[in-house]
């Protein structure tokens, strides 16, 4: 949408989007919005506030702008509508950029614990990173207040801590090799033209 030549006010729209990147609404208005929408203590409270990133939107925009307009025009002449052009031309040509955006979102969401600590009250719904944070904090606090009789439990606490760190790191380590071939290409395509 923002890469097309015939869109009026596209520079103004981009300025508004970039403005939100530098000056966000803040934590309290976001919390009040999530609470008033009835999303508090649901998984959607963690997903929706971070669903669209301005930085990733700019990368996608520059990636789509690098696709030649001749393909768009040729598909229109052949009778394709906007949905067909998007799904059969733009998406296949943007696999590298989509893989990079997927990796950015995956790593960012996987490592996020702060939003979950604000929006989730039920311990059953805590994500792994928040559970890991609680394990690390409780283990650190337990080692500070323990006396000689607790030395046996310190080894168990350290084992649990390191096992939780491995479990939290493993999914990203498994996914990254499959996306790595797209990663460098997608980052370069998204940064060259703009």
Task: List where the protein language model places each region.
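A hydrophobic, multi-pass inner-membrane permease signature
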Residues: 1-194
């Amino acid at each position: 949408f923002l890469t097309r030549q015939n869109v009026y006010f596209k520079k103004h729209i981009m300025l508004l989007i970039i403005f939100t990147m530098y000056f966000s609404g803040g934590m309290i208005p976001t919390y009040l919005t999530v609470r008033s929408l009835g999303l508090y203590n649901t998984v959607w409270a963690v997903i929706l506030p971070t669903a669209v990133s301005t930085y990733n939107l700019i990368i996608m925009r520059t990636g789509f702008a690098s696709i030649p307009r001749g393909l768009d025009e040729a598909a229109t002449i052949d009778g394709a509508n906007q949905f067909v052009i998007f799904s059969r031309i733009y998406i296949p040509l943007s696999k590298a950029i989509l893989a990079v955006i997927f990796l950015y979102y995956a790593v960012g969401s996987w490592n996020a614990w702060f939003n979950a600590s604000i929006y989730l009250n039920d311990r059953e719904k805590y994500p792994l990173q928040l559970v890991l944070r609680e394990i690390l904090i409780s283990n650190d606090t337990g080692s500070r207040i323990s006396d000689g009789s607790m030395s046996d439990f310190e080894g168990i606490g350290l084992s649990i801590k390191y096992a939780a760190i491995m479990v939290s790191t493993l999914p990203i380590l498994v996914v990254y090799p499959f996306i790595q071939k797209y990663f460098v290409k997608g980052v370069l395509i998204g940064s060259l033209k703009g």
